[in-house]
């Protein structure tokens, strides 16, 4: 896991809990530790049924403020079937 994510791991988990999200993982270059200075942070989350898109938007903005980088949030149910296996294989739980 990239040092930036590791440094803010507990804060990211707290943000997720505050927004009612669970089982948060990092994937992509930040999980593989081949991120560049301009790489974004990819987060995979499980959302309870009925969760509003506003909740994901709030989590996204809070995570970007915390990390000082662009963040992408993907729900497990919305994973692209073509990429699903790779994402799940490399995902690391926060």
Question: What positions do the PLM features span?
Answer:
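Conserved G/P- and acidic residue-centered "switch" motifs that form tight phosphate/ATP-binding loops
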Residues: 28, 42
């Amino acid at each position: 896991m990239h040092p930036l994510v590791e440094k803010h791991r507990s804060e990211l988990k707290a943000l997720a809990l505050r927004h009612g999200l669970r089982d948060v993982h990092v994937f992509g270059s930040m999980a593989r530790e081949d991120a560049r200075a301009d790489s974004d942070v990819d987060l995979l989350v499980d959302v309870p049924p009925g969760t509003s898109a506003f909740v994901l938007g709030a989590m996204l903005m809070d995570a970007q403020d915390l990390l000082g980088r662009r963040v992408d949030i993907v729900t497990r149910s919305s994973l692209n079937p073509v990429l699903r296996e790779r994402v799940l294989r490399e995902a690391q739980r926060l």
